Amino acid sequence: MPQPVGRKSTALPSPVVPPQANASALRRVLRRARDGVTLNVDEAAIAMTARGDELADLCASAARVRDAGLVSAGRHGPSGRLAISYSRKVFIPVTRLCRDNCHYCTFVTVPGKLRAQGSSTYMEPDEILDVARRGAEFGCKEALFTLGDRPEARWRQAREWLGERGYDSTLSYVRAMAIRVLEQTGLLPHLNPGVMSWSEMSRLKPVAPSMGMMLETTSRRLFETKGLAHYGSPDKDPAVRLRVLTDAGRLSIPFTTGLLVGIGETLSERADTLHAIRKSHKEFGHIQEVIVQNFRAKEHTAMAAFPDAGIEDYLATVAVARLVLGPGMRIQAPPNLVSGDECRALVGAGVDDWGGVSPLTPDHVNPERPWPALDELAAVTAEAGYDMVQRLTAQPKYVQAGAAWIDPRVRGHVVALADPATGLARDVNPVGMPWQEPDDVASWGRVDLGAAIDTQGRNTAVRSDLASAFGDWESIREQVHELAVRAPERIDTDVLAALRSAERAPAGCTDGEYLALATADGPALEAVAALADSLRRDVVGDEVTFVVNRNINFTNICYTGCRFCAFAQRKGDADAYSLSVGEVADRAWEAHVAGATEVCMQGGIDPELPVTGYADLVRAVKARVPSMHVHAFSPMEIANGVTKSGLSIREWLIGLREAGLDTIPGTAAEILDDEVRWVLTKGKLPTSLWIEIVTTAHEVGLRSSSTMMYGHVDSPRHWVAHLNVLRDIQDRTGGFTEFVPLPFVHQNSPLYLAGAARPGPSHRDNRAVHALARIMLHGRISHIQTSWVKLGVRRTQVMLEGGANDLGGTLMEETISRMAGSEHGSAKTVAELVAIAEGIGRPARQRTTTYALLAA
């Protein structure tokens, strides 16, 4: 491969050797590398000091690990040799404006310079499509969207350009352009727009098979110290960038990340960066490739005089990346930032992917470094003993995994370009095809599950992808252990003193006093329950209320990855099903005939549910039974609908209200504390978004219930914090109709089966939670509901004597708790609910969803 003009081999001094990196320590680390042992952070930093024969030894170990991974993945080329992959791409620099000031960057500019160059603030749609069309003619499969971070946050010109064209953000424009590229050219977008939130990535996933963001470094020193590489760049905060990696994992997005080598980081910081990537991938399995990129100084930047990364330093880092990240990770090095000889050396150090290489567009981030010609790169790869094969923007294992990783709205575009046997790219030119929402969901699968769950039970004990759907169980158990360590061993506040305080002002105690009440046992617990029962009597009297309703869980297809949930199935599982809109309406009519005043509709987050699906269900029920109260869609379902529609939360909720939605269930809350929440669930909405959705629903006239699921990995301090969140919302909106404590049903829960959760709450926990809720919510939420489905009749009666006043509903069918292993049935008649109340000497009364009492 000829050396391009101006391309010099890198030959610079090695970084300062860490004090611990003496010869004997290095020999020990190299021996561990030869033995296939994963290097810890200190060992990785020491290994990066290897030079000469030691470096050759290190690279040989890394190459063996790489080859083992390629063999395991079946990654062979046309000649039968192991294969190194690349993606044939076009580079689309959507905008060169950015709110950051990275000291090494020439990609980013300012509006004045763009104007002087005669360039637009953003690439116009026609420009983007022209590049993509020409790329398709060259056989490119990937459209790399690269741009600065949130330019509209800094530049008035960016805000004006977007506003004139009807976009509220750069990411909205990127999404629209990705759809146009898919539809008009068939190229697959790979989105690299910098830092994104959970909601933003949720919105972008349906238009791109993969996304990416370089972690670069975990060094806070480089971020916080004036004059260093990332100072003055808010989006280069390592904590923020690690959060992006985590959110991408929670959303099951095939994600590219990596590190920059030689921007002023120490070897220990470099090693820590690799381990941070390893930890994120271990938990979620979503990091599809790690780019190890060598720093190249550029003229007219603050770091123009900073030395390039030395080649031995670079090779050692690549080798260590391979050893830390293991055989299954694709390790990538940009071939245009090194010479041909150095490319061969990188292969020897464990590289197995060249990343995106364009036969058409320059590397706009490194414009002084042209891409090697593809035939030249293939020749270099062959000289190193490997075939070079073309892949898609998503690595093969994610392509072949299907709906678990690739959204169905872009799945067809991926399938059109993928070899079904390997997941690599087919030798075809892309062709545009429609990007559209799925059609109406048809009825299929075990649609009788609601009725059959009580007589026939489940067909399978667990869903088919139990081993892969929820992330790494070892990592999850470590998080549970950390939660347990932080749980208080004793309560300093005296329970009797807390009781006296609660008697004087139930809603005015300190958190410490509430925690004391929550941990009470024995006679103290009896006193807490008695106080709660007294408050109940004062607020709502002795009547036990209930609603005649029907649960309609319209689908159990879900890929969110809630680790506590035994209801969710993947498509094709023996217990999986979806109801058609017509079947849902039929069940609402059946409920009406049986005397129901409410249907409660919730379902899994099925990626094939059309954007109109939620409103269609509401309209169908209202058309069949105009008087039926529709209580439907958890905040997670609302977040999903908002993501699909592109509307704001407020706009989408108003649309549902106009379709006939009456109230929403305040489910999907679990525990409103993210340290617990991210153990319980992989991909569910974060606490802040749950609060925003519920608050907005109340503001547009959609009242809701409120809930808390307890008895898994939580502790009493989480109960207090959760109830405080609900109190704050109620103070602002007054929109909660009731509070429903939901005991964790453990029997079939993946989290419990993996040994990470308790076997549900104890009887003490149940009594304490119901009583605590009555006390803490006094004066704010009058109705405390207890779940006969989860507790059974006798324990339900105990809760009614300790603060609760409501039995929930008749349900008619219930699949969520029953699939989790609840043994208390899925339906109660009115007579049976009345009998529960009369069994403790209390009258029962039917109510509406919003607690208006109905005539006896």
From Swiss-Prot:
**UniProt catalytic activity:** 5-amino-6-(D-ribitylamino)uracil + L-tyrosine + S-adenosyl-L-methionine = 5-amino-5-(4-hydroxybenzyl)-6-(D-ribitylimino)-5,6-dihydrouracil + 2-iminoacetate + 5'-deoxyadenosine + L-methionine + H(+); 5-amino-5-(4-hydroxybenzyl)-6-(D-ribitylimino)-5,6-dihydrouracil + S-adenosyl-L-methionine = 7,8-didemethyl-8-hydroxy-5-deazariboflavin + 5'-deoxyadenosine + L-methionine + NH4(+) + H(+)
Recorded GO MF terms: 4 iron, 4 sulfur cluster binding; 5-amino-6-(D-ribitylamino)uracil--L-tyrosine 4-hydroxyphenyl transferase activity; 7,8-didemethyl-8-hydroxy-5-deazariboflavin synthase activity; metal ion binding
- Record region (CofH-like): 521-854
Family annotation (Gene3D superfamilies): Aldolase class I
Which residues hold [4Fe-4S] cluster 1? 98, 102, 105
An example of a Gene Ontology BP annotation on this entry? coenzyme gamma-F420-2 biosynthetic process
Q: Which UniProt keywords apply?
A: 4Fe-4S, Iron, Iron-sulfur, Lyase, Metal-binding, S-adenosyl-L-methionine, Transferase
Stored SMART domains: Elp3
Tree of life domain: Bacteria
Cofactor annotation? [4Fe-4S] cluster
Radical SAM core domain: which residues?
84-336, 544-785
Cofactor remark: Binds 2 [4Fe-4S] clusters. The clusters are coordinated with 3 cysteines and an exchangeable S-adenosyl-L-methionine.
Annotated pathway: Cofactor biosynthesis; coenzyme F0 biosynthesis
The family database entries (SUPFAM superfamilies) matched by this protein are listed as: Radical SAM enzymes (SSF102114)
> What would be one Gene Ontology cellular-component term for the protein?
plasma membrane
Q: Which residues bind [4Fe-4S] cluster 2?
A: 558, 562, 565
InterPro entries recorded? Aldolase_TIM, CofG_family, CofH/MnqC-like_C, CofH_family, Elp3/MiaA/NifB-like_rSAM, F420, FO_synthase_su2, rSAM
Its Enzyme Commission number(s) read 4.3.1.32, 2.5.1.147
Q: Where is this region: CofG-like?
A: 85-417
Output the CDD domains linked to this UniProt entry: Radical_SAM
Q: Name one Pfam family in it.
A: Radical_SAM
- Tell me which family the UniProt entry assigns to this protein: In the N-terminal section; belongs to the radical SAM superfamily. CofG family. In the C-terminal section; belongs to the radical SAM superfamily. CofH family.
HAMAP family (UniProt xref): FO_synth_sub1, FO_synth_sub2
What does this protein do, in the record's words?
Answer: Catalyzes the radical-mediated synthesis of 7,8-didemethyl-8-hydroxy-5-deazariboflavin (FO) from 5-amino-6-(D-ribitylamino)uracil and L-tyrosine.
Q: What is this protein called?
A: FO synthase
- Report the gene name: fbiC
